[in-house]
């Protein structure tokens, strides 16, 4: 399958886009076709073995329109050219329409003045007054009309061409309506001439008042005025992305062979050393090699506070170096940069169609033929009821010019384009219109714990000394832990470094599996580990041990430290909750969304996190491979589910969910399994994404309502339905004005989304009274049986294990379980602190528990 984007020319309304879509969709091999009227583009997914680009272009041309392959973004400037090509085209269209409008007004104003002046009492030259000058009066109007028709000839060229091809569009309605007025006006000139020849002044007077040239000219000018305003508004729909692309630098300072030089951005190569000075834009994505800086990433990630950068940190192209000087190595250039990927994602999203637009698409396909039929029937009906030709003709013209298929075609894409652009500015990348629509109806948000609710990195939360002083305890602990590879050790070392404490000399370092580490710190034997280690070495301190248990109840991991047989204190380490997680969860709950947390932790730790952030429900002890099953279980219960995860370990769950949201993507925005990508690691952006989705869908519904309501009311009024009862009849010029402004209204309403701002409240998390009403449940990992080739029954059991802290621990447990007779396979997972074993019927739970305990760890439960 291949997916390509095409630029389509000649479309003017929803009927045009509908015809192009149908023409391509019926080609053999075409799987999916989406035409975007706003962007004049088409995305086609097709089977290359059955269909080619040339055949697709030929199908569009046969339908009466032009098509060409869309330029593919390359480097940042190329991306800018490709994406802003639409903006440039919109700007050119606006410029052309302004010229057409100015020239049209140049002739329409005197035409209108001449035709209406005698009725309004305006001064007119004597040669235009009185019945004796009727021919001069009529012919001058005709001459003033001709340049207006020529200036707006495109309506006739396209309108009659599509009518001839039996696929009439909005231009057909304009061409038919104005042509009817012109033909009748020419007929009136002949009748005036005949009247003069026969000296029939009554005929002269009658047709002198029924010329309709001013109606034809004014209709064309008013529609051009509306299209000018529409073109201006359309140009603003892509403002967000245009401004984003404007940030991309055109040049970069590169250092090659010790020589600095300024080169065009497209010449930057992978691995180049680049120099970025204060006030300059970061040219491409890369890694800081030397120097420090404060970088403003707000344009890409929505993060308002500048981010401090130093050697080893990543930087994103198109962000601004606010202060400092640094050297960087280019790691992503051209189409691979975050900026280019953002442009591509937004471009694809704005080219896609939301399911909500399907009704409008169906109506657009038959709208124009139905309107023409109504106009013919209305004209004939009024003639048959004895009304004058002038009256019946004005009815028919009014029906033709008031009908507006454009509003139907613009209702959805304008809101989608502005909404996705606004999301991109806030660091929220929505990949498709369908994802945007689905998000607004989500009623359950599932959050992965690690890295989503929490920081994903252990930090020191509590330091409790046993009398030797906090700094002394940290210094001793960090000195010993510095030799360990354990993740919790890194947290203690980082805390000591942050406080600039002294690291002491350590000898005879030793790791004790399942317990901790030991060594001599400046000649004194130091033990560091869990409570089991303290008990094994007969070290007691009831007060400190009790405090450790209390910290464990809060979901923290207490590490005890003893010096020469005496407990000197404990340090608690935990993966702490992000500052905004509780607020974000409270906001989601206030929007009527149930929040569920999935975690591999045991129920005790899960409950501690739940109490901190106020989630509605927690599913604990979930293995990474089982997250997708939990999502499916929620969906089977009738829930519309959004899954929020890191996009890597959670890929199956993200793909299974109705909406997959990858959080904290940073520069990696092309996460395949996600429908929405959040560049920041902030749960508040989930709330923002839901609010934005609801705002966009509400806007689309407003637009569609207006488009249907306008036509449903306007067409009957124009047809004279209310004339017998209320003498309500629409002038064709008023109909043209109404039609022009209906499209302008739809686009202008969509532009309101440019000022969308998420409402974030400082809401406190819901209070949880006690674990008894916690809503924490253990994942449904039922024991599964299967028959092997020999007919033996293998069972799968899941063991929850305490005490594992690193990959060494994982290896120890795996070896211990694999050595148990009857165990076919053992898989140990550090994140969920569990082991999944495949065993035959002879293996007992007691044997598995004994194997884990003998390895120095604790088997908490076996399922």
Question: Model-derived features: where do they sit?
Answer:
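Actuator/coupling domain of P-type ATPases
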Residues: 55, 61-70, 74-81, 85, ...
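ATP-driven catalytic headpiece of P-type ATPases
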Residues: 99, 443-485, 515-596, 675-676, ...
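Membrane-embedded alpha-helical bundles of multi-pass transporters
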Residues: 120-136, 164, 183, 422, ...
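Conserved cytosolic catalytic loops of P-type ATPases
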Residues: 28-37, 41-46, 50, 211-213, ...
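Flexible metal-binding regulatory segments at protein termini and peripheral loops
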Residues: 1-136, 148, 234, 243, ...
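Hydrophobic alpha-helical transmembrane segments
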Residues: 143-155, 162-165, 179, 215-244, ...
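Conserved ATP-binding TGD loop and adjacent catalytic N/P-domain core of P-type ATPases
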Residues: 2, 18, 442, 521-523, ...
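Residue-level signature of catalytic and energy-coupling elements of molecular machines
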Residues: 13, 20, 24, 44, ...
């Amino acid at each position: 399958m291949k997916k390509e984007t095409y630029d389509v020319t000649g479309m003017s309304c929803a009927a045009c886009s509908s015809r192009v879509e149908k023409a391509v969709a019926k080609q053999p091999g075409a799987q999916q076709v989406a035409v975007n009227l706003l962007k004049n583009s088409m995305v086609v997914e097709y089977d290359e073995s059955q269909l080619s680009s040339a055949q697709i272009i030929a199908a569009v041309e046969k339908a009466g329109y032009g098509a060409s392959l869309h330029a593919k973004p390359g480097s940042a400037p190329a991306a800018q050219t490709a994406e802003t090509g639409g903006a440039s085209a919109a700007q050119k269209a606006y410029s052309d329409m302004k010229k057409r409008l100015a020239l049209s007004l140049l002739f329409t104003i005197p035409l209108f003045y001449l035709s209406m002046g005698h009725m309004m009492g305006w001064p007119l030259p004597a040669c235009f007054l009185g019945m004796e000058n009727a021919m001069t009066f009529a012919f001058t109007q005709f001459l003033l009309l001709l340049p207006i028709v020529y200036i707006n000839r495109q309506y006739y060229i396209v309108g009659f061409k599509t009518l001839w091809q039996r696929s009439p569009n909005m231009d057909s309605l304009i061409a038919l309506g104005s042509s009817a007025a012109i033909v009748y006006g020419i007929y009136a000139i002949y009748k005036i001439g005949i009247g003069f020849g026969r000296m029939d002044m009554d005929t002269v007077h009658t047709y002198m008042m029924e010329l309709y040239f001013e109606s034809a000219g004014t209709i064309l000018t008013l529609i051009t005025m509306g299209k000018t305003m529409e073109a201006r508004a359309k140009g603003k729909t892509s403002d967000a992305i245009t401004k984003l692309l404007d940030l991309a630098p055109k040049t970069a300072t590169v250092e090659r062979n010790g020589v600095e030089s300024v080169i065009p951005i497209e010449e930057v190569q992978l691995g180049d050393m680049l120099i970025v000075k204060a006030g300059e834009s970061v040219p491409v994505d890369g890694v800081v090699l030397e120097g420090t800086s404060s970088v403003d990433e707000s344009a890409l990630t929505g993060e308002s506070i500048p981010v401090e950068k130093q050697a080893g940190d990543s930087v994103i192209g198109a962000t601004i170096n606010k202060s400092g000087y640094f050297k960087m190595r280019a790691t992503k250039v051209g189409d691979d940069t975050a900026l280019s990927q953002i442009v591509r994602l937004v471009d694809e999203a704005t080219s896609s169609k939301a399911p909500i637009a399907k009704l409008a698409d169906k109506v657009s396909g038959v709208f124009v033929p139905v309107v023409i039929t109504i106009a013919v029937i209305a004209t004939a009906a009024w003639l048959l009821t004895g009304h004058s030709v002038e009256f019946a003709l004005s009815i028919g013209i009014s029906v033709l010019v008031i009908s507006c298929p454009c509003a139907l075609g613009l209702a959805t894409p304008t809101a989608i384009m502005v909404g996705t652009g606004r999301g991109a500015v806030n660091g929220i990348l929505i990949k498709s219109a369908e994802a945007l629509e689905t998000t607004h109806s989500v009623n359950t948000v599932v959050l992965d714990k690690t890295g989503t609710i929490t920081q994903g990195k252990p930090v020191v939360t509590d330091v409790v000394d046993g009398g030797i002083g906090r700094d002394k305890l940290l210094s001793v602990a960090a000195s010993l832990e510095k030799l360990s590879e354990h993740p919790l050790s890194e947290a203690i070392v980082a805390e000591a470094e942050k406080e600039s404490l002294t690291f002491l000399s350590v000898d005879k370092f030793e790791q004790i599996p399942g317990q901790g580490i030991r060594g001599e710190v400046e000649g004194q034997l130091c033990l560091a580990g869990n409570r089991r280690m303290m008990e094994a070495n007969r070290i007691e301190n009831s007060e400190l041990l009790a405090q450790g248990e209390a910290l464990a109840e809060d979901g923290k991991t207490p590490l005890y430290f003893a010096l020469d047989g005496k407990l000197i204190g404990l340090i608690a380490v935990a993966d702490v909750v992000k500052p905004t997680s509780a607020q974000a969860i409270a906001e989601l709950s206030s929007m009527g969304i149930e929040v569920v947390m999935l975690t591999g932790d045991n129920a005790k730790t899960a409950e501690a996190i739940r109490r901190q952030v106020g989630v509605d429900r927690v599913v604990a002890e979930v293995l990474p491979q089982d997250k997708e099953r939990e999502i499916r279980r929620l969906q089977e219960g009738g829930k519309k589910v959004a899954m929020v995860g890191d996009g890597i370990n959670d890929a199956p769950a993200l793909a299974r969910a109705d909406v997959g949201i990858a959080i904290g993507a940073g520069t990696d925005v092309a996460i395949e399994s996600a429908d929405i990508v959040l560049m920041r690691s902030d749960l508040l952006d989930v709330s923002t994404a839901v609010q934005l989705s609801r705002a966009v869908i509400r806007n689309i519904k407003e637009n569609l309502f207006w488009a249907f309501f306008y036509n449903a009311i306007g067409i009957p009024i124009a047809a004279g339905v209310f004339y017998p009862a209320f003498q309500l009849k629409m002038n064709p010029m008023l109909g043209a004005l109404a039609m022009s402004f209906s499209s302008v209204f739809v686009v202008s309403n969509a532009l309101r989304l440019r000022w969308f701002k998420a409402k974030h409240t400082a809401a406190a998390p819901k209070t949880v009274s006690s674990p008894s009403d916690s809503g924490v449940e253990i994942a449904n990992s039922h024991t599964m049986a299967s028959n092997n080739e020999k007919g033996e029954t293998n069972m799968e059991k899941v063991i929850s294990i305490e005490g594992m802290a690193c990959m060494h621990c994982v290896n120890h447990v795996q070896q211990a379980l694999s050595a148990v007779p009857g165990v076919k396979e053992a898989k140990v997972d550090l994140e969920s602190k569990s082991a999944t074993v495949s065993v035959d019927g002879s293996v007992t739970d007691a044997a598995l528990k004994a194997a884990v305990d003998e390895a120095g760890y604790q088997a908490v439960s076996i399922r």
